[in-house]
A protein has these predicted regions:
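TPR/TPR-like (Sel1-like) alpha-helical repeat modules
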Residues: 203-221
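Terminal, low-structured helical/coil segments at or just beyond the last alpha-helical repeat
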Residues: 216-251
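Hydrophobic face of amphipathic alpha-helices that form TPR/SEL1-like repeat modules
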Residues: 10-17, 47-53, 85-91, 122-129, ...
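Short helix-capping/linker turns of helical repeat alpha-solenoids
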Residues: 1-5, 17-19, 37-44, 53-55, ...
Length: 251
């Protein structure tokens, strides 16, 4: 009612999805347009993304691109990251395409010139994986370290993953522990994974479950999946043991 842009975007999503209230696509569209006319850059980015396929606004990629491009030209690093990851879909881009080259350039600009922490993390992951850009462990470490220096909790887990991919599980554990100590859910979830398989540490399912629970509490979805798999295995084992007991009784 008071025209707070982030709240308008949230309300537009509720209206567009029919969540918590009656669906109103036109009302959602009007709120998004109103948000784009404000000076609240974060809300404008969020509103622009709703015009991409899958958003609550009527699909209008041109409008989304135009809004984000305008913000990029003004030096908005969040818009650079949004354009690279959402418009260019950098995670799924093929190597050496215009999309991958432009996306990497935007992320590097956001990371180096504007110290954007998300850009640092994405670049570290992309250089570590080598699917979109040629694998470069040195650059992966460099961007992870930049994120650590910028006090990004997830960066410790990102650094751990780099060493895990190199096969240096003991060093990976060191980094996961550093992230876990500051309650980074991703690092805690990865610690649980390492303990569950005995990678770089002595296998300890009790510790694995403990770390997964902490990670789930701190928002790590993968840890929640690991916990569910662990519970399913326990149920299956219990059911098998009981079936064996029943067989022995009948003999």
């Amino acid at each position: 009612e008071i025209g707070y842009p982030p709240a308008m975007v949230m309300m537009a999503r509720y209206l567009g999805q029919g969540k918590y209230m009656e669906k109103d696509s036109e009302g959602a569209w009007l709120l998004l347009i109103k948000t784009l006319k404000t000076k609240h850059d974060v809300a404008r980015i969020q509103a622009a993304l709703e015009f991409l396929p899958g958003g609550v606004g009527p699909e209008n990629t041109k409008r989304a691109k135009s809004t984000l491009r305008g913000l990029i030209n003004d030096g908005n690093s969040k818009a650079m990251v949004a354009y690279a990851m959402k418009v260019l879909k950098l995670k799924n881009a093929k190597p050496n395409t215009n999309e991958s080259k432009e996306g990497i350039e935007l992320l590097e600009r956001a990371a180096r010139k504007f110290q954007n922490p998300k850009a640092m993390i994405f670049l570290s992951l992309l250089y570590n994986q080598g699917n979109v850009v040629k694998r470069n462990e040195q650059k992966a470490i460099e961007y992870a370290q930049l994120a650590i220096d910028a006090k990004v909790p997830q960066a410790f887990g990102t650094m751990g993953q780099i060493y895990q991919n190199q096969g240096d599980n003991e060093k990976a554990i060191e980094w996961f522990k550093k992230g876990a100590a500051i309650d980074d859910g991703f690092s805690q979830g990865m610690l649980g994974f390492m303990f569950s398989g005995g990678f770089g540490v002595k296998q300890d399912l009790a510790k694995a479950v403990d770390w997964w629970r902490k990670a789930r509490w701190n928002g790590d979805r993968m840890a929640a999946s690991y916990l569910q798999v662990h519970r399913d295995k326990q149920k299956a084992q219990k059911a098998w043991k009981e079936s064996q007991k029943e067989k022995l009784k009948k003999q």
